[in-house]
Design a protein with these regions (language model features):
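RNase H-like, metal-dependent nuclease domains and their acidic two-metal-ion catalytic environment used
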Residues: 1-99, 103-181
């Protein structure tokens, strides 16, 4: 059960300027499309973040040694990033980023300039639920399959937006393109 959409988001700071969502895309076209968009918007490769967990072989090779070499990997199940030298109490990087995204939304720090997908984005973000504390006391999110079951699709827009929190957590806010496949 893969993703429903290939989602690319172009950011200017914390403003979503452009969203491209493609229902089906050939794996060989993924890196080509990202690179075209990156060049069009003059975004350095280091400011491109991609979902490393969802990559197919061709795209993974491109990210490692091809036209996307130098882009930033996002690994959902990676260990949370230390903030101010302190270990964070999240199950994984994805949970850490979603909790930061929730705080930023509450504080009205994000703006979606792109109008085409607002309804889907809001619907998806409203479905992200925290799980009860586990035995280890870590903050965690419910599985994507539960969300897919409720709304009838994968929360691909929400996941792509969530990945934008990575540079915020790291303290390196420059980012241009986020893509979730």
């Amino acid at each position: 059960t893969g993703s429903d959409k290939f989602v690319l988001i172009v950011w200017a700071g914390l403003v979503i300027e452009k969203i491209i969502a493609i229902d089906k895309i050939d794996d060989t076209q993924v890196s080509k499309r990202i690179n075209e968009l990156r060049i069009e918007h003059r975004i350095p490769l280091k400011n491109v973040i991609y979902d490393a967990d969802g990559l197919q072989t061709f795209t993974r090779n491109s990210a490692n040694s091809g036209v996307l070499s130098g882009a930033t990997q996002f690994n959902n199940n990676a260990v949370p990033i230390k903030v101010n030298g302190k270990k964070e109490n999240y199950k994984n990087l994805k949970a850490q980023c979603y909790f930061m995204l929730a705080d930023m939304c509450k504080d009205n720090l994000l703006f979606i300039q792109e109008k085409n997908y607002r309804t889907q984005i809001i619907q998806e973000l409203e479905q992200i639920n925290r799980l009860a504390f586990s035995d280890d006391g870590k903050l965690a999110l419910e599985k994507k399959d539960a969300i897919r079951e409720r709304i009838g699709r994968s929360p691909d827009f929400a996941d792509a937006i969530m990945m934008r929190m990575l540079p915020e957590i790291k303290g390196t806010q420059k980012v241009g393109i986020i893509w979730n496949n």
